[in-house]
Amino acid sequence: MSGRWSFRPRRHERLSRDETIVSRHGPLPEMGSGTESSLIVPVLSAEDIVDGLRRRLDPSYATMPAHITLLYPFVPPSSISESLTEKLRELLAHFEPFDFALSEIGWFGDQVMYLAPSPRAPFVELTSRITAGFPDYPPYGGAFDEVVPHLVVGEGARRARMRGAARRLQRYLPIHGFATEVLLMSPSPSGHWEVRRRFPLGRVRRQ
């Protein structure tokens, strides 16, 4: 394992291994089966604001930080090799760090409440560059024509509860962020996600 984060279950909290995300296009594939990895942008600047809501409303709270997913599913954990790592490192080094803001609350049906990043273009471009380099791994298995960048705040809770949370959250927007790295994550046998590799943005090697 590489990196300083290991997202273990917090005491007194039950984890769900059936973490189905629902989009406006229909249900997305289950995340966290143990056979696939994920590439994410962590959004640590949002945690002080969204942690309390995620703890109550998001089943993945105990196993993942606040984040925006770039690509899932990605390679099986057993396929995370040095050659794959180097390819990702070189690809992401050509993408400069960027500012963004979480300024709007969005919904996938009544099941998922999320924060939408603005601008969304850098996240879309990152996903496009990664999938161009790894065409066997389209976002969500190629299930959708468009994948919307988002930070999940609540999933699967009662509608009234999530609507109330959205009203409270609105007072704290926008939340400003700065994307500096991409994390390659994979689930451990115990169910929590671990950082396998870190890829800084914008560090092109000079000859």
Predicted segments with their positions:
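Generic recognition of long tandem-repeat/solenoid scaffolds
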Residues: 114-117
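Short, basic/glycine-rich phosphate-binding loops at helix/coil junctions
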Residues: 106-112
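Short strand-connecting beta-turns/loops that link adjacent beta-strands
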Residues: 110, 189-190
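Short beta-strand segments and strand-loop junctions that repeat across beta-rich extracellular domains
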Residues: 180-189
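Basic, often amphipathic N-terminal segments
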Residues: 3-99, 107, 119-180, 193-207
